[in-house]
Amino acid sequence: MSTNKVKKVKMATKSCPECDQQIPVACKSCPCGYVFISRKLLNAKLNERSGVMDKLEDKRRRTERIRKEKINLTSTSDMENRRRSRTNSHSDPIRRGRGRPKTVGLKKQEEEKEKQEREVDIYANLSDEKAFVFSVALAEINRKILGQRLIL
């Protein structure tokens, strides 16, 4: 009752054109002497021949988009009327704007100007004695910083 079952392994094979023998695909030559030409060799030979063609293809873009011709359904007089009507609509101030409003930038500039004016006003009311005290304090701070060699 013990029967040995032999599993057949199916391989990818190719047939030799000279002797019609089945040979594994990985083999480059047949035992009869026939040599199979690899695709790499074929491509190399084709590339040598098509050297001139490659130069022509290099000038062209590889990915060219197919452009469809637009059909002009409107006549030129209609287009002129549309252009005129659009120019009139631009003068209307009731346009709904998208995105950030333009006044935001102006407000920031006004705030910066006000800050500068405030700073100028603060120092303008400073007495001569206070200005002298502050200048001495700043000189002392600068001397200490330079003594530490923090600023190179």
Swiss-Prot record:
InterPro entries: C16orf87-like, UPF0547. Residues 49-71, 107-118 have a biased composition (Basic and acidic residues). Pfam families: UPF0547. It comes from the Eukaryota. Residues 49-118 are annotated as: Disordered. PANTHER family: UPF0547 PROTEIN C16ORF87 (PTHR31101). This is UPF0547 protein C16orf87 homolog. Belongs to the UPF0547 family. Keywords: Coiled coil. Residues 42-75, 102-130 form a coiled coil. It comes from Danio rerio.
